[in-house]
From Swiss-Prot:
Name recorded for this polypeptide: Lysophospholipid acyltransferase 5
Entry comment describing in which tissues the protein is expressed: Detected ubiquitously, with high expression levels in small intestine, brown adipose tissue, liver, kidney and testis. Expressed in liver and both proximal and distal small intestine (at protein level). Expressed in peritoneal macrophages.
Species the sequence originates in: Mus musculus (Mouse)
Coiled coil: none
Similarity remark: Belongs to the membrane-bound acyltransferase family.
S-S bridge residues: none
Amino acid sequence: MASTADGDMGETLEQMRGLWPGVEDLSLNKLATSLGASEQALRLIFSIFLGYPLALFYRHYLFYKDSYLIHLFHTFTGLSIAYFNFGHQFYHSLLCVVLQFLILRLMGRTVTAVITTLCFQMAYLLAGYYYTATGDYDIKWTMPHCVLTLKLIGLCIDYYDGGKDGNSLTSEQQKYAIRGVPSLLEVAGFSYFYGAFLVGPQFSMNHYMKLVRGQLTDIPGKMPNSTIPALKRLSLGLVYLVGYTLLSPHITDDYLLTEDYDNRPFWFRCMYMLIWGKFVLYKYVTCWLVTEGVCILSGLGFNGFDENGTVRWDACANMKVWLFETTPRFNGTIASFNINTNAWVARYIFKRLKFLGNKELSQGLSLLFLALWHGLHSGYLICFQMEFLIVIVEKQVSSLIRDSPALSSLASITALQPFYYLVQQTIHWLFMGYSMTAFCLFTWDKWLKVYRSIYFLGHVFFLSLLFILPYIHKAMVPRKEKLKKRE
């Protein structure tokens, strides 16, 4: 689902619709006022797009240069961006980076270091949420800090894995395990990389070090041929930005809280939530596509070659746009949206809970971690609780259709496929919007008001299916199919 700084990015793009008129005064404050945006929003937008000239500078002047120069460049530019956006509050990130380095050096590759890192970094982030919380989305230092928190926790776990015997690690853990001892400059460069400091994406220390060593290129010994792929992602991001800018005055979060919405027919309330639920995610899509382009341009997006020898630039992709736009399933949206954050949680939380012996419990705890990572508001918990419920029910429905001969035959009728797709998409985006209502409104008085207006439809629908589906499965799946499945 949506990523950390999601709300803050949303607030930024919400205010982008006024960015087109020209102004004469170049003062940021006056410029922002003229555009109908906040100064913080303007600073954030400028900082995200600043990644492109910085990536060009790196390509032409620092590629294959001494590693310490590259680390210094990333550290200086990242700290400058932090100061430009948050002033003296940039010290929060710097403090956590330095303390994390000390934890690695003083505690070494131990479980104690991992537990200390997890507790300290999450506690610092949650304390930041608590002391800066308001009833609305604000662009403040906690926005990039939640991205940094995952980076530093992942860094410590990979460092811990680097001290283990290779045979005791999975192939994935071997890929990310850090065998050497990172210096303070390396940790700082990794943390402050300009293309991902503010809004992500997540990437590992090993991948970052490949960038520094000049290994992330499709032409060994030369700069990566990544300008066109980067411009394609930038262009796609701008398409989403223009669409969002034009439509945002007409499809707003605030309308869900109005009396006019309450007084509309039930079908209208549901249809508005469906359309809004799809549209509200475009602000996140925009930011991630733009920052992905920065990562590709620098080379960080290089992901080797496919089986046909075609170069892949999706190492930092946070979106699978085609899948996101066409999938009729909730799992499809999860697989296509905020990819690197979801992969991080799967790698460092979900799979590490394997010892519990219960996949659903591990998944539930992973989603609880994600909810807390997003913030302390109740809406985040409700949103991820709905995701957990929906995914479980969707798996049960898929299993029922697959195992039932009657339903399987009905589902395979070609002439009915367009109808099935339309029904699936309607259910999919209606209840995606239902879940996003709590996420975007986030305080209990707001999301509760909207849920009451549609009679808690999402909870009633999926909780009913959760209890009814086992009986339907028992009635419609022949005994021999059940025995075959067990075998």
